[in-house]
Amino acid sequence: MVFESDTNLMKKLQILSDAAKYDVACTSSGVQRDGIKGEIGNAMSCGICHSFAADGRCVSLLKILFTNECIYNCRYCINRVSNDVPRTSFTPEEVCRLTMEFYRRNYIEGLFLSSGILYSPDYTMELICKTLHDLRVVHHFNGYIHCKAIPGASQELVELAGWYADRMSVNLELPTEAGLKELAPNKSRKNILTPMRQIQSGMAQSREMLGMKGGNRSAYWYTSKRLGRSMEIEEHKITPDSSLIGGRNDRFEEQKNIHKSSNDKTYNLSMDTGKNAILNADFKGRKSEKQIEKTDILSMEEHKTGSNALTMWNKTDISRGFVPAGQSTQMIIGATGESDYEIMSVSEALYKRFDLKRVFYSAFINVNNDSTLPAQVGGPPLRREHRLYQADWLLRYYGFEANELLSEKRPFFNTFLDPKCDWALGHLEDFPVEINKADYNTLLRVPGIGVKSAGRIVRARKSGSLDFNSLKTIGVVLKRAVFFIT
């Protein structure tokens, strides 16, 4: 027997899961939290194995929008206010029910929750916080949760979501501020970067107070430390007030009537200036390093009343830590005229200044058939998206920098060669590499040698010299590496 309420819920699920398919969530949880007796869910299993649909969606997560209603009119978005599409919204209880029922049936390993803007950023974010609270506290859901932070929402609501979610993300949307103004005039770079900074500062505090429970570091951070590079984020630590820590750990009390106007001082968070021009509207390409250092990443005044310090230590369960799986973001590629060089420079700045775990790249799809947007004769730029992901991997794990891979004179990747091979062919003076003498960082720059195989080479050399057969056994892709090693 099918009840009418169940039928309506399934219709909502069909609409809101389809509306969420353009949000990228294909990543492991990054959380080492086992199952707990009396609770439901295991965040570790979520990080072990994911299944992906043909279009790249992560199907092991229940990936839905809370609502596809939206007050904004972004030209690239299927859910923009001017579109005539079926509209619906979940309630917090419905999201909890779907998540728990799908998890019990082993259909999913966690929840990915994003949303359009219903009435206002604060109103929408409060509904999301209510949903996360009920999942964690009422239903004792211990699985993985990835939650989107709504740009423009109050600092208190963003922090509250961070105590319940494993990962949070704020979509950058487009690489440059000029592109954002052109295609998403209702959004601002300030409203996007403000919660990013808040989450980054909160994670740093959580790590300091809770150790590893406060969250693990990003791959980019570890790579930078290995190479002896300084991370700009470490220059801006915030020390929490000791009076906020300790005492009784009160259960969350649902906050009502906490909506704030867009002019509320809560939005004016303290933001330090940066050293990269690439997030400014007037960016014309990377110039000299000295000139870049004098350019702010975002022009924001310092406000004495604003603070990124965590304030809810005694109001929530802090055992999970604050956003322990880190934060990520997503950029649409190909909707505006940015070069690959500009895009990778933006990503590099985000890794350095906001401690991001991942930057996701989404090939532009003209879902609205907007004639003013770039024509897609050959379909979405999927190969370009793939090259950006490969280059992003080189930044995070291999120690490359954006200005090594590309330049103003050569601002786009070679579509026929992966970025690492392309770089090697442009730097033949560094090759061939003596496989039995080269250090770990040098080995990483050899095409065909990855992070694991480079480590195996270093360890295997302690037992004797290596030949090509040994390298093949280790896992080196010889058909690429053979031209660059000796």
Walk through the language-model features, giving the residues of each:
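Flexible, acidic/Gly-rich N-terminal and inter-domain linker regions that tether
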Residues: M1-E69
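Short, charged beta->alpha transition segments
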Residues: L62-I64, E93-R104, N314
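Canonical Radical SAM [4Fe-4S] cluster-binding loop centered on the CxxxCxxC motif
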Residues: I64-E93
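Short Fe-S-cluster ligation motifs
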Residues: M100-S114
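Conserved AdoMet/S-adenosylmethionine-binding subsite of the radical SAM
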Residues: Y119-D241, I245, N249-Y398
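Low-complexity, acidic/Ser/Thr- and charged residue-rich accessory regions of DNA metabolism proteins
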Residues: N368, K472-T486
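Long, highly charged, low-complexity intrinsically disordered interaction regions
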Residues: P374-R445, R480-T486
